[in-house]
């Protein structure tokens, strides 16, 4: 799920379904709009997969997408200002231009058991 830097919409647009453990929305409000003070209640949730959000601050990044059995699907180029939610399947990256990015994902980190590494190929099967 990619939100390009030039994406614009009115109001609040959620890109994720309610059952995703990581929610991603775009918000556009006029000056003076009030978002009421609030806090989020402590709620127990079960999270089975890590979902990551990447914000590209600077540079260019190629993202390769794989299905759950490591088959190559497609690639996309991310540029400065783009945001991506990696919600399922596998992914790999090639830095095309010097890169600065911010990664956000669920914790706590569980060490080596958190991910399975594999040899990726850009050939479709």
Regions found by a protein language model. Name each.
Residues 1-26, 121:
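A short, N-terminal "cap"/entry segment at the start of jelly-roll beta-barrel domains
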Residues 30, 49-66:
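Glycine- and acidic-residue-biased ligand/ion/polar-headgroup-sensing regions
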Residues 30, 56, 79, 86-87, ...:
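A short, compositionally biased micro-patch
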Residues 37, 63-64, 84-86, 91-96, ...:
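Short beta-strand His + acidic residue motifs that chelate non-heme Fe in jelly-roll/DSBH
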Residues 92-125:
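Double-stranded beta-helix
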